[in-house]
From Swiss-Prot:
GO function terms (MF aspect): ABC-type oligopeptide transporter activity; ATP binding; ATP hydrolysis activity
Record-given protein name: Putative export ATP-binding/permease protein RT0691
UniProt keyword list: ATP-binding, Cell inner membrane, Cell membrane, Membrane, Nucleotide-binding, Translocase, Transmembrane, Transmembrane helix, Transport
Listed InterPro entries: AAA+_ATPase, ABC1_TM_dom, ABC1_TM_sf, ABC_transporter-like_ATP-bd, ABC_transporter-like_CS, P-loop_NTPase, Type_1_exporter
Protein location: Cell inner membrane
Binding site for ATP: 371-378
Domain ABC transmembrane type-1: 20-303
Pfam families on file: ABC_membrane, ABC_tran
Entry's family note: Belongs to the ABC transporter superfamily.
EC number: 7.-.-.-
Length: 576
């Protein structure tokens, strides 16, 4: 096992010193009770049964009962406190991992699968609990029992104890031989399990599409393929574990048989008493079971340590942070400017999405953005939100370079509504106040009326306090978009970004809602990406983007007269 990993785990353990002291006292009490029983057995046979001394027999039985009580009580405290510590630590680790993950740069999520994240935060962290319990409880207990058992065996018979010691290297050879192989298999098994979780997450997030295309059988087949891959690694690992366990059992019991054989000869010759040989066999069994337990734990330790390693990579991953951020000015008016901005995604380094883009948007403007798919419209918004950093050029808000401003401060000024409305599995109200949890009931009710949520929420049993299911499954696409827009408006942003945010609404509803938005956002900036030209006809001006550049700009009327590319976009919509 990697010592660095143990040291890392020990940093968490230091917060639970009192609990761990109780665990250690309990462990020693359990070990001492079991070891003392062997000594009592010897007295029972040699002084009680051999001498027909019923008083000695009764005393020995009483001592055994007392030791069993101590053993039981100590076992309870050991089990309770170590498992309690393990749960507290894994929850602390889970919180740290979650907190770090949720603060990653957006582009870092492109390298991760949601299923892998879920697997690490659940399965991997549960494995860490197993590591804590096994190491701090069973490993230490078995180590104490092994050392104590061997020591007491030497007190009983040096010759027989020497035979037992010889068997230890025999057990170490296969452990070392199989150890590296098991570690590799454990890593592959965890990765394979992550793929399973990803598949489950993807399947049930897209269950309607699967039903619509009758792909249930195909998905079952795909899942079975991944399941079989996971099972292959598990089977190999279990075979190695079973083989090692079989070797351990064989060596342990052959050793005990040899001890009985030689011990019987010593009894006949008068070198050992019957009580001594029984006591020795008892200690040999204790030592054998303890060593078997240790080897069993060591053969299985690679799975939880690999899981710990995977979690530590999440906790230790540091996103790029600049300490020399400036505060974002908060004047009465707001402005946006792009100066010669270039951008490419890390996943597509050879494809320039934004190409030397320049534009300026002043306060009190409603700006529409159009362009063909892949032109860079949504990327423009994501750069403004600081989801990504531009490769070249400068992006300014209020004449300040946003690369020098904390992204959190930037986003306080902005509200963003994507085409696919992000809805949480909570109530309508909770989803709305996600934009501003300090809003008054009056403000919430006004936004609900303005966005038309009242029209459908009043028909629900609990109104805006109705639970709407995972991802708003109980709502229509248009209803979800209204909630997302209400959330954005409640934020009282200086800049409102709409990325096809009303695509699920009919034209009349869209115009009504848009007029309401324009009133609320008066004096500020609205940027609306649209595939439906009708939604931006009333814009102050429209930016036409092609191949990552603003190729032309103007009102709908001017562009319809003077821009061929704009007319083509309009014609393409009419043919859809």
């Amino acid at each position: 096992m990697d010592i660095k990993l143990l040291y890392r785990l020990a940093k968490y353990l230091r917060f639970y010193k009192k609990d761990l002291i109780i665990v250690m006292i309990s462990l020693l009490s359990v070990s001492a009770s079991l070891l003392l029983i062997g000594s009592v057995f010897r007295n029972l046979i040699d002084k009680g049964l051999a001498e027909d001394n019923i008083l000695s027999v009764n005393k020995s039985i009483l001592y055994i009962c007392l030791l069993i009580v101590i053993l039981s009580v100590a076992s309870f405290f050991r089990s309770y406190f170590i498992n309690n510590v393990a749960e507290k630590i894994v929850n602390q680790i889970r919180k740290e991992a979650y907190s770090n993950l949720i603060n990653y740069e957006i582009e870092e999520y492109e390298e991760l699968k949601i299923g892998d994240i879920i697997s690490r935060l659940t399965n991997d962290i549960d494995q860490i609990a197993t590591l804590i319990v096994n190491f701090l409880s069973f490993f230490i207990r078995n180590s104490v029992m092994l050392i104590g058992g061997i020591t007491l065996m030497f007190f009983e018979s040096f010759k027989l104890a020497s035979i037992v010691i010889v068997t230890i290297p025999i057990l170490l050879v296969p452990l070392i031989k199989f150890g590296k192989h098991v570690k590799s298999l454990s890593k592959k098994a965890l990765e394979s399990k992550s793929l399973l979780v990803s598949d489950i997450d993807e399947t049930f997030n897209n269950i309607r599409v699967i039903y619509a295309f009758n792909h249930q059988i195909n998905k079952i087949s795909d899942f079975d393929t991944k399941l079989q891959s996971y099972l292959i690694y598990c089977k190999i690992r279990l075979k190695i574990r079973a083989l090692f366990f079989a070797i351990s059992i064989a060596v342990i019991f052959l050793t005990i048989t040899l001890i009985v054989w030689i011990g019987a000869s010593d009894i006949v010759q008068g070198d050992l008493s019957a009580g001594q040989i029984i006591s020795f066999i008892y200690y040999a069994i204790i030592a054998g079971v303890s060593s078997g337990g240790i080897f069993e734990l060591l053969s299985e330790i690679h799975l939880p340590t690999t899981a710990l390693e995977r979690i530590i990579t999440i906790i230790d991953k540091i996103s790029i942070v600049h300490n020399n951020y400036y505060a974002l000015n908060n004047p009465d008016t707001v402005s946006i400017e792009f100066k010669n901005v270039d951008f490419t995604y890390n996943s597509r380094p050879n494809l320039k999405i934004i190409n030397n883009m320049s534009l300026k948007i002043n306060a009190n403007k409603f700006v529409g953005i159009v362009g063909r798919s892949g032109a860079g419209k949504s990327t423009l918004i994501q750069l403004l939100l600081r989801f990504y950093r531009q490769d070249n050029g400068t992006i300014l808000i209020n004449n300040q370079d946003i690369s020098r401003i904390n992204p959190t401060d930037i986003r306080k000024f902005i509200a963003y509504v994507p085409q696919e409305a992000s809805i949480f599995s909570d109530t309508i109200k909770s989803n709305i106040i996600f934009g501003n949890n300090k809003a008054s009931d009056y403000e919430i009710n006004e936004i609900i009326k303005i966005t038309g949520i009242e029209e459908f929420s009043n028909k629900l049993h609990d109104g805006i306090n109705t639970k709407i299911g995972e991802k708003g499954v109980r709502l229509s696409g248009g209803q979800k978009q209204r909630i997302a827009i209400a959330r954005a408006l409640l934020r009282k942003p200086k800049i409102l970004l709409l990325d096809e945010a009303m695509s699920a609404l009919d034209t009349m509803s869209e115009q009504k809602l848009l007029n309401a938005i324009k009133k609320i956002m008066k004096g500020n900036i609205i940027i609306s990406i649209a595939h439906r030209i009708s939604s931006i006809e009333s814009a102050d001006y429209i930016l036409v983007i092609d191949k990552g550049k603003v190729v032309t700009a103007g009102s709908h009327y001017d562009l319809s007269k003077n821009s061929e590319i704009y007319r083509n976009i309009c014609r393409e919509q009419l043919t859809i």
